[in-house]
Amino acid sequence: MNVIEGVVATPDARVAIAIARFNHFINDSLLEGAIDALKRIGQVKDENITVVWVPGAYELPLTVRALTKSAKNGGYDAVIALGTVIRGGTAHFEFVAGECSSGLSSVAMDSEIPVAFGVLTTESIEQAIERAGTKAGNKGAEAALTALEMINVLKAIK
């Protein structure tokens, strides 16, 4: 039986992180977690990490698409999308969260480059804070580890 599993240690990986500025007080923690995981666990060199700030989560799919096109030309091995969408009193949450998730998935499928989903979609600020490095771990770090593992899984498949 042949089993393919990815490892997270990927010292030569080139990784881009697209991060939303909206809700930055939460996203900053996601970014810290992602960078820490890339460098400490994945052994990715600092010069191989690029951070791109965008206004909000809705802008992430377009930005990630541009970064994956760069990847096809020798740019990035994976892209991590980070952001936070918190439910409010209007339908805005559904539109932003849904389009962001759908758009990022579409980019990953079209580009065949790992796109790690580190966008929090929560009911409250408290839930977001818990997922950005307190009670529920750091979803930015989890997204970074997912990106690294997927780089290696896809290399092994090809």
Swiss-Prot record:
(2S)-2-hydroxy-3-oxobutyl phosphate binds at G89, T90, R131. One of its GO terms (cellular component) is cytosol. It catalyses: (2S)-2-hydroxy-3-oxobutyl phosphate + 5-amino-6-(D-ribitylamino)uracil = 6,7-dimethyl-8-(1-D-ribityl)lumazine + phosphate + 2 H2O + H(+). GO terms for biological process: riboflavin biosynthetic process. The keyword Transferase applies. Pathway: Cofactor biosynthesis; riboflavin biosynthesis; riboflavin from 2-hydroxy-3-oxobutyl phosphate and 5-amino-6-(D-ribitylamino)uracil: step 1/2. InterPro entries: LS, LS/RS, LS/RS_sf. SUPFAM superfamilies: Lumazine synthase. 5-amino-6-(D-ribitylamino)uracil binds at F22, A57, Y58, E59, T84, V85, I86, F117. Disulfide bonds: none annotated. One of its GO terms (molecular function) is 6,7-dimethyl-8-ribityllumazine synthase activity. Its EC number is 2.5.1.78. Keywords: Riboflavin biosynthesis, Transferase. The active site is at H92. Catalyzes the formation of 6,7-dimethyl-8-ribityllumazine by condensation of 5-amino-6-(D-ribitylamino)uracil with 3,4-dihydroxy-2-butanone 4-phosphate. This is the penultimate step in the biosynthesis of riboflavin. Forms an icosahedral capsid composed of 60 subunits, arranged as a dodecamer of pentamers. Belongs to the DMRL synthase family. This is 6,7-dimethyl-8-ribityllumazine synthase. It comes from Pectobacterium carotovorum subsp. carotovorum (strain PC1).
